């Protein structure tokens, strides 16, 4: 692991020295490429414009090092992540620099300007199924959590923008756990607005959607509901082999469940439709503390509002006419 880190830092240092005053523009283009705002070819063209002919290899070396760092835990084929360039490339070990290399570059340069059919190198258009497109790596496209390699790549780019040299494995693990817990908080806030739940220690929510609800017309129901033994009392000196946070005995738990069932209502709550954007919008408005950052909160609320939809009067009228026609057609068939 230390070898990959040293290679990445060395490649970054060489690239920064080759770029000079253009290093900020290069980091901005790299961030756009990671966000898929620009394509790989456009990023290469901008990098070649900022670098000289002799320093283009530092661009390839840096990208190869950063992709290798992000894919350490994944087995990749040899040479993955290398960016092709028809000009100068990094000097290979065992091959000394000399006039032979310069002459080959001149030959390639002259060969590029030989007349040929421009359509011969055009890429043929092949229709692809959107589900089989593997180039989309954004979470909004894949509908999945970002992988560890994707988070590490984004963190490395952000660290370079703020003048940092590297990202540790502990920082990546902390961000992974933070993303998971953040999504759990959002889901808990949405479900708690739709289903009943119980509290433990005054703040921990559990037993979502429980059918056992207190009967308001029975005096003992509220008492039985509020006097549950949620955790055993803390022992000053637990015995050997005894877990101080163990559950209540099975007999006590069975008696509590029977008492709650006897004191609960007779009717079960009606089934709810699937969670939609309106439920998420209401949950974020009520539980404002789920997204404490105002900038992130305002941006996501705006996105949710843009995706809200409900039928207007014309659509409702058309649906009514359509149902009447279907009913009339079914009546004619029965006759």
UniProtKB/Swiss-Prot annotation:
Pfam families: SAGA-Tad1. Keywords: Nucleus, Transcription, Transcription regulation. InterPro entries: Hfi1/Tada1 (IPR024738). GO terms for cellular component: cytosol; focal adhesion; nucleoplasm; SAGA complex. It is found in: Nucleus. Its main location: nucleus. It comes from the Eukaryota. One of its GO terms (biological process) is regulation of transcription by RNA polymerase II. One of its GO terms (molecular function) is transcription coactivator activity. Belongs to the TADA1 family. Probably involved in transcriptional regulation. Component of the STAGA transcription coactivator-HAT complex, at least composed of SUPT3H, GCN5L2, TAF5L, TAF6L, SUPT7L, TADA3L, TAD1L, TAF10, TAF12, TRRAP and TAF9. This is Transcriptional adapter 1. It comes from Bos taurus. The gene is TADA1.
């Amino acid at each position: 692991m230390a070898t990959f880190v040293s290679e990445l830092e060395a490649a970054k240092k060489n690239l920064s020295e080759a770029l000079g005053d253009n290093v900020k523009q290069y980091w901005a283009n790299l961030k756009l490429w990671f966000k898929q705002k620009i394509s790989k070819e456009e990023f290469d063209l901008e990098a070649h414009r900022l670098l000289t002919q002799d320093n283009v290899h530092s661009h390839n070396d840096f990208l190869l090092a950063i992709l290798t760092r992000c894919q350490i835990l994944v087995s990749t084929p040899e040479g993955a992540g290398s960016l092709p360039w028809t000009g100068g490339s990094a000097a290979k070990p065992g091959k000394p620099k000399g006039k032979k290399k310069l002459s080959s570059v001149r030959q390639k340069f002259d060969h590029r300007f030989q007349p040929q059919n421009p359509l011969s190198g055009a890429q043929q258009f092949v229709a692809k199924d959107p589900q089989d497109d593997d180039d989309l790596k954004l979470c909004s496209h894949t509908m999945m959590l970002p992988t560890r390699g994707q988070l590490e790549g984004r963190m490395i780019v952000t660290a370079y923008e703020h003048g940092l040299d590297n990202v540790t494995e502990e920082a990546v693990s902390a961000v992974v756990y933070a993303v998971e817990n953040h999504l759990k908080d959002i889901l808990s806030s949405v479900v708690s607005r739709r289903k009943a739940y119980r509290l433990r220690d005054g703040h921990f929510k559990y037993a979502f959607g429980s059918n056992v609800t207190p009967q308001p017309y029975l005096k003992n129901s509220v008492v039985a509901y509020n006097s549950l033994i949620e955790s055993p009392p803390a022992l000053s000196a637990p015995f050997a082999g005894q877990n101080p946070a163990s559950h209540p005995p099975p007999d006590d738990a069975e008696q509590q469940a029977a008492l709650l069932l006897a004191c609960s209502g007779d009717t079960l709550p009606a089934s709810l439709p699937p969670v939609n954007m309106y439920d998420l919008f209401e949950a974020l408005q009520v539980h404002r503390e789920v997204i404490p950052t105002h900038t992130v909160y305002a941006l996501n609320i705006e996105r949710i509002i843009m995706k809200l939809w409900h039928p207007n009067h014309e659509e409702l009228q058309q649906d009514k006419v359509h149902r009447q026609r279907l009913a009339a057609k079914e009546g004619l068939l029965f006759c």
